[in-house]
Amino acid sequence: MAKKITFNEDARRGLERGLNTLADTVKVTLGPRGRNVVLEKKWGAPVITNDGVTIAKEIELDDPYEKIGAELVKEVAKKTDDVAGDGTTTSVVLAQAMVREGLKNVAAGADPISLRRGIEKSVAAVSKALLTSAKEVETEAEIAACASISAGDPQIGDIIAQALEKVGKEGVVTVEESNTFGTELEITEGMRFDKGYLSAYFVTDAERQETVFENPYILICDSKISSVKDLLPVVDKVIQSGKQLLIIAEDVDGEALATLVVNKIRGIFKSVAVKAPGFGDRRKMMLQDIAVLTGGQVISEEVGLKLENATLDLLGCARKVVVSKDETTIVDGAGSSDQIAGRVSQIRKELENSDSDYDREKLQERLAKLSGGVAVIRSGAATEVELKERKHRIEDAVRNAKAAVEEGIVAGGGAALLQSGTSALKDLQLTSEEAVGRNIVRSAIEAPLRQISLNAGLEPGVVVGKVSSLPQGHGLDASTGEYVDMLSRGISDPVKVTRSALENAASIAGLFLTTEAVVAEKPEPKPAPGPADPGAGMDF
């Protein structure tokens, strides 16, 4: 296919038009008085949202150069969302401001490479200043305040704070749709996986249709168990100990399963068999996690262990096990804390080195099951449109709160970026050409506050001047129009969110400014429709 090639100023301006179209759509959502954007869907109800990355993903432009410009900015929003879970609109506003100022300077003859270097050094200085001024998040109330701002709802903020208090920052907080109104929180203690009992005859609590064991042994095997003679030696040892047995294996069937069921029905020996969670290599990893958590070993021929030779010291233990039709929960495994910490550290390293979103999600789940726990927030609403919008807001707020716990918080509403940034840039030593890059960043760090003011119906220039003269940490509460101590009012942003937004915006601005040519697909003319059949639709 033929290509269109554009050079110099024309190329950069084409990209900028696409950036501006996307940024102007997204930035109306910024701040407590930001508006929503309605997104049409090919199927089903439209989506109403104020989430920057969701809006950005939906924007497709006709002009090939504008399309490329918009795609570059989408990448800023997506990267910020991936790293910090929020701040997507802020990152787009910052990118637009940097590109606009930068292109003016390039058009006036500034060296793009020096500009880029100046921008990078300035952003590094501002990021360092933000981290230095950060306040650690310690109390449940502080976490709730952070989550409330992201979700725009204090009740959601309180529920997220409770969830993180229970499961810790490594724990998993998932958001599910509910058939009822309101928002509920459910906490799962211990490790839970989505495999239930292999036979309903194992049930010990008929009312709840669950098998509940106190202090059972746990047999973990990575192969299929069909023969009763393989299972009998270890079962005999467990019977002599007077305890119950949970069997986790690739599968349990045939005479092995029948024998366990018969012994349970006759009241001779209580046990329950479940399939191992996951598939392939992930199954092996999860079995190893269960073994570490319960203080047992995976009985596998790969490590020279056979089921018929298994002894009680190879079995795991837990304070309580609950098995339902669909899932198994192991509470308070007897594994050593050192081994669990080592396993957690290993998974964390894998998480850092993983590029796949799917793998990262699964590793995060494993990490949570070992180190924290799982909290489920169930959200309901009157209509499907409201339900989807509410669920999305809660997911963003969860990630925002986790980011706050990780690196701390700074004053929100664009105040920290403006105040910390201005003082950091004042002391920065740069060459005369790089100093132009500093001026671009100095102008850009005002942009979020300007947009928040504009969306609140205030005069941006007046607000920026006022906030610049206020003490560190004071700023504009855009919901009331008052100038207040932001942190004491609960108006805060996680440092990770603000820092990621600034760094990602600077990265894309540098690419824009150093672009000298753009190669795009040349749209093919659509073939003219053929002549209509004169006899079509007539009966003969």
Curated annotation (Swiss-Prot):
Keyword field contains ATP-binding: yes
Q: Which InterPro entries match?
A: Chaperonin_Cpn60_CS (IPR018370), Cpn60/GroEL (IPR001844), Cpn60/GroEL/TCP-1 (IPR002423), GroEL-like_apical_dom_sf (IPR027409), GROEL-like_equatorial_sf (IPR027413), TCP-1-like_intermed_sf (IPR027410)
The UniProt record gives the binding positions of ATP as T29, L30, G31, P32, D86, G87, T88, T89, T90, G413, D493
An individual GO BP term: protein refolding
What Enzyme Commission number(s) does the record list for this chain? 5.6.1.7
**Could you give one GO CC term from the UniProt record?**
cytoplasm
Assign the protein's first listed, main location to one coarse class. cytoplasm
Q: Which CDD domains match?
A: GroEL
Assembly and oligomerization = Forms a cylinder of 14 subunits composed of two heptameric rings stacked back-to-back. Interacts with the co-chaperonin GroES.
According to its UniProt entry, the function of this protein is described as:
Together with its co-chaperonin GroES, plays an essential role in assisting protein folding. The GroEL-GroES system forms a nano-cage that allows encapsulation of the non-native substrate proteins and provides a physical environment optimized to promote and accelerate protein folding.
State the NCBIfam families in the record.
Answer: GroEL, PRK00013.1, PRK12849.1, PRK12850.1, PRK12851.1
Q: What is the protein name for this chain?
A: Chaperonin GroEL
